[in-house]
């Protein structure tokens, strides 16, 4: 499959598909988030396997919505598998019990948190701190610009320093991007993208921007009827055996 010749779902279609999964499909948001986050963790494990000498330090940037929840789930799986030390930055929290539970699960695994964007800057800018990877789970396909506080300063810092910091793995779309058109004024220049359910239109811009970009597909929970309705059967068919992720070549 060519790098950018894959089926995509618009933000509107992706939202409709999610609603269908949770209505007639009888999935709960907990299930979908767990499977999505597991896919992200597996893609990271495959692309950035644990070191033999020491753990990989993974900075997880968590947003206020479902995309952030996917990041929290991914952090838990990476911690449980061993070889990874996730650190959270979760500046804008929701009172939703689902997210509170995910954070509690991470606290029970002794996962640490950063308190401010200044803490993030200090951590990623010091080579000896050893941040090996950054998970961008700030904004998903429902994001609408402009970027507001407290995320504007963080996105700007990532965009201006992407060549000096650890590789960034974005969940579903690179944060700050327009889901259909791609990068806006600020581009965090993620190294890897994990598209969930189906790539969004901006994914084509992502892979075409550089031959070094890495693109995975995850979120294997689409039944054949829904796949046919949304014309993404060829994506579902890419999964092999019991694999939960696909790497686009």
Label the model's feature ranges.
Residues 42-140, 146-171:
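Nucleotide and nucleotide-moiety/phosphate-recognizing core
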Residues 2-9, 21, 130-249:
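YjeF_N-associated NAD(P)HX repair module
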